[in-house]
Amino acid sequence: MWLLGPLCLLLSSAAESQLLPGNNFTNECNIPGNFMCSNGRCIPGAWQCDGLPDCFDKSDEKECPKAKSKCGPTFFPCASGIHCIIGRFRCNGFEDCPDGSDEENCTANPLLCSTARYHCKNGLCIDKSFICDGQNNCQDNSDEESCESSQEPGSGQVFVTSENQLVYYPSITYAIIGSSVIFVLVVALLALVLHHQRKRNNLMTLPVHRLQHPVLLSRLVVLDHPHHCNVTYNVNNGIQYVASQAEQNASEVGSPPSYSEALLDQRPAWYDLPPPPYSSDTESLNQADLPPYRSRSGSANSASSQAASSLLSVEDTSHSPGQPGPQEGTAEPRDSEPSQGTEEV
């Protein structure tokens, strides 16, 4: 690609050497189809009256027949009859037509040089936005003479160089503002969704954490006044109870005393009395005072005799309640001694 530049220069120089008069190929201008400029340069005949000056003296565009304009009502036809420009570009200080016909006879039209435009000293009229923009729009530098130093080129101030750019500035501004508002709304909505999702995840993982770290019942304290305590929940340590200062003082005052303190403070009245006198007569008991010894078989016989006597007494009462039975008298002396022995034992 970098070889194309020098190659084009060589070809153009060779073509000019062939077309220029005075060289070995000066007779080529006599060939039909070529056009000789007023300065003696030869150009192809197709370049004549094409709306673009190819000769240095613009002789190829002189005495050309003007074609009928085909431009619309809002366009300005150039003098060549080939090109059309936007109507507001006429007499704006720039040659928009290739032949510069859009900047000719500008002072003759009062509408184009109205008070809304800037009148140059040479008679041209330009838009007021072109004043002090750092460019010679009036072609006599009259639009840059009365400018302040702060508005000189290179001061960082942005200037508008054409009227069509003013039309696009509001739309660009509105587009930037709308995009910024949409971006802020999207970011806020995304942040709200993320916050809601994180909160939901924390609520879902809380029961699992409680299963992994069960709460010990021994660490829980039940109080009569729960509003005097502070209960904090920690993810790592579980439930923690922090009592208030007043409750701690009350618990210290109302706590039961120790075993040794209770014995010293609450001794009975007889604790300090002297012991009773020692008597040796009480320990020696006579064998006659003791009840007779009864074996286990004897006690069983006495129990059976008592049961039999109770049955006989029931039968006697059923026959004659007022008279004792015949066997009641015989059974009573025999059972009196065993019953007495069992009761005393």
UniProtKB/Swiss-Prot annotation:
Pfam family, any one: Ldl_recept_a
Family recorded in the similarity comment: Belongs to the LDLR family.
CDD domains xrefs: LDLa
Tissue specificity remark: Expressed at high levels in brain, lung, skeletal muscle, and pancreas. Expressed at moderate levels in heart, placenta, and kidney but not detected in the liver.
Membrane topology: Single-pass type I membrane protein
Organism: Homo sapiens
Cytoplasmic-facing ranges: 195-345
Lineage of origin: Eukaryota, Metazoa, Chordata, Craniata, Vertebrata
Main location: membrane
UniProt effect for mutating residue 277 to A: Does not affect interaction with ITCH. Loss of interaction with ITCH
Motif, Involved in ITCH interaction: chain positions: 256-259, 275-278
Molecular function (Gene Ontology), one example: amyloid-beta binding
Domain LDL-receptor class A: 28-65, 70-107, 112-148
Protein name, entry field: Low-density lipoprotein receptor class A domain-containing protein 3
Keyword Cytoplasm among record annotations: no
Protein's UniProt keywords contain Isomerase: no
Signal peptide as annotated in the record: 1-17
Name of the coding gene: LDLRAD3
PROSITE patterns with a match to the protein in the record: LDLRA_1 (PS01209), LDLRA_2 (PS50068)
GO terms, biological process: receptor-mediated endocytosis; regulation of protein processing
UniProt biased composition (Low complexity): 295-313
